[in-house]
């Protein structure tokens, strides 16, 4: 099946470019990659944690408990000992400065892979890197991971103000004031935003408002979303606003390799027309990155 995956990760231990190349040769699949997020592969939570998470975050009271717990995962960008229990006691170290240059060099020979320019504006010289790579032919847009890098609105604002060509922005939210998020999306209304992970950790609390904004889209990436949440996204959002993304190569493993077949089992597209299905898998993201 042909698709255009709008968010995959480079991981030096897991990303299998032969697998991606075979998908392109067989189905003409395309991908937008993001730099590595940890030294060693990203820690994968237990299935129990993934199962409970949507229920916790959908409850207003439990949401605040989850917010407090989330602040205990890392110390000085290293996963704390207690949380290693859930990741096989591996020593994960969060990358604070995404290595865009390395990824761009790696994907240079792959015509079917583009890249997000992942910027952490809390780091010194981030704006210089932004300016030096902004016009790179492989860069389709900007990525901001509010949760991973604990970004404030002012820091995000600086990057968005320097986005002179209004390139699309892939943004993953954090536990933050919803009104402030919406204010930013409205302020930069000439920029197209893709809200990653179905709006995690806010989910339905933010859906009604972002669905009203013509410049804002939502994707279905990662195991932070279950079947019910994905079904609700298809019920809530206009079909041209839903983006196919996977978070490859994490989770959904078959013989220690990411399986798109397993990932796709969560997504019911039977209710879609042929056009809507093609738009979801291919055209919606193409329309965003190609104007």
Which sequence ranges carry the predicted segments?
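Catalytic pocket-lining loop regions of alpha/beta-barrel enzymes
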Residues: 140-141, 148-149, 153-244
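Short, well-ordered coil/turn elements that cap or connect secondary structure elements
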Residues: 26-27, 108-110, 136, 188-190, ...
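Conserved, mostly hydrophobic/aromatic
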Residues: 7, 24, 103, 133, ...
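Glycine- and small hydrophobic-enriched segments that form the cores of compact globular domains
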Residues: 114-118, 168-169, 268, 272-273
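Short active-site segment of divalent metal-dependent hydrolases/proteases
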Residues: 10-11, 200, 250
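Mid-to-C-terminal alpha-helical segments outside catalytic/metal-binding sites
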Residues: 1-4, 15-31, 38, 239-241, ...
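Short secondary-structure boundary segments
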Residues: 36, 222, 246-248
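Mid-domain alpha/beta scaffold segments of enzyme catalytic cores
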Residues: 1-154, 261
């Amino acid at each position: 099946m042909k698709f255009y995956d709008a968010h995959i990760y480079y991981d030096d231990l897991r990303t299998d470019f032969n697998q991606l190349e075979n998908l392109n040769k067989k189905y003409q699949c395309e991908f937008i990659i993001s730099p590595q997020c940890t030294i060693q592969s990203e820690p994968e939570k237990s299935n129990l944690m993934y199962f409970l998470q949507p229920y916790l975050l959908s409850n207003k009271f439990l949401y605040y408990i989850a917010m407090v717990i989330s602040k205990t995962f890392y110390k000085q960008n290293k996963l704390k000992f207690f949380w290693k229990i859930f990741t096989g006691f591996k020593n994960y170290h969060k990358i604070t400065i995404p290595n865009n240059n390395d990824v761009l060099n790696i994907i240079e020979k792959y015509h079917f892979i583009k890249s997000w320019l992942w910027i952490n504006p809390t780091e010194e010289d981030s704006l210089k890197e932004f300016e030096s790579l902004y016009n790179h032919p492989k860069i389709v847009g900007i990525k901001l991971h509010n949760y991973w890098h604990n970004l404030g609105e002012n820091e995000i604002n600086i990057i968005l103000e320097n986005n002179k060509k209004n390139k699309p922005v892939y943004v993953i939210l954090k536990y933050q004031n919803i009104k402030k998020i919406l204010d930013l999306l409205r302020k930069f209304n000439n920029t197209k935003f893709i809200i990653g992970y179905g709006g995690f950790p806010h989910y339905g609390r933010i859906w009604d408002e972002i669905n009203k904004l013509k410049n804002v889209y939502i994707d279905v990436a990662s195991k932070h979303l279950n079947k019910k949440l994905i079904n609700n996204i298809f019920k809530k959002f206009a079909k041209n606003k839903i983006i196919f993304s996977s978070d490859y190569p994490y989770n959904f493993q078959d013989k220690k390799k990411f399986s798109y077949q397993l990932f796709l089992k969560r997504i019911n597209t039977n209710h879609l027309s042929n056009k809507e299905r093609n738009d979801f898998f291919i055209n919606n993201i193409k329309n965003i990155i190609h104007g």
